[in-house]
Amino acid sequence: MVLKNVFTLAVVTAALSLQSAFAQTETASTSSDWLNWRGPDQNGSSTQTGLPQALSPKELQWKMELPGKGCSTPISVADSVYLTAPDQGKDTILCIDGTGKKKWSRSLGKESPGRHRNGSGSNASPVSDGQGVFASFKSGTLAAVELDGTIRWQLDLVKEYGKASMFWSEGTSPVLTEKHVIMARICAGESWLAAFDKQTGKLAWKVDRNYKTPKEGDQGYTTPMVIDRDGVESILVWGAEHLTLPNTSDGQASWACGGFHLKKVGLWPAVASPVLVEDMIVVPSGRNDKRKPILHGIKMAGEGDQTETAHQWKREDASTFVPTPCVRDKKIYMVRDKGEVECLDPKTGETIWADKLPKSRSNFYSSPLVADGMIYAPREDGVVFTIKVSDEKFELAATNDLGESTIGSPIVFGNQVLVRGQKHLFCFAAAK
């Protein structure tokens, strides 16, 4: 199962600003770089302007053929794009220049193909600190490469820790702290969080993260989020029906919250990742089917287990299963699995407006991007919708068809938008 990026969940006080809440190391990068699955603020948003208002042939700058089916989201560092894909049965990291030409590719061992029809062995998105690129694959490979493609180090997590017991293929992406690359394994059986030295790959710490849940509830495809609380670098993790906040120095949790599925419904893995707006964590859970998914508003305050006090609101009529929400101007924007679009107030959970995209048999797996007054939302069949962002109403700006399946999430690359399809990487810029 895919995410994208997905996955991903990174203690914050009520007074903590959104800007200071996110602390991802970007040592050699620029503010316009897209260093991880959900971008600079880890919430699917960008302040870049001059972006295309539609993703049509008129705005298409180039498209590059990819070597194989991968569902990860690309990242960008300076003028280069990095993505993962299978190439002739090998897990591979690709580097692409700003014109759509391949600069280099690095094979990292045998691919383990995906199980879901929309999955792959390259579900997890790469991540960068501006100095190197870190990538993980279903095969168990976790690797760090320099920006020129030189392998810094490579590990086999399956050989070292065993295979993850999951119904679908892993979707959790690695995340970076100041010193470490963090991997979260949230699965049936032995689950854990581990930190590896960014320079050497040496294990810094590893902590168990095991919770008893109904069937499949212990399986997570989300991606952690790295945040800062009062100067303490921490990792917000969602999965196995619990939010936890380990610190990055030794993995010990300073805050936690359970109590999400009191009805003990089975077959509810965690797929969409939470988003953070000031001290509120908005957590999607449950499948978007007749059992109805739930959206939770959790206030991050205090220390220790805050299950009894953290739950502020709950919506049983509006949530998402696979696509992770995005954030703009302290508002939550959701593109749900069946094309429902909703703008919400994270403090109260109240709907500001709601509407629907054109009905289709195809679902949304990609997580939306909000930038330059637009929401970009690809559907799995390759149809991409652009929606004008408004505090008052829904307005569909454009509908375009890429002609191939789209699972990865769109990103901003300079003043362009990149969308990864099943066969190609597409680059769009504002029409002149």
Regions found by a protein language model. Give the residues of each.
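Bacterial N-terminal signal peptides
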Residues: 8-20
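Noncatalytic, solvent-exposed loop/strand surfaces
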Residues: 22-432
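N-terminal secretory signal peptides that target proteins for export/translocation
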Residues: 1-4
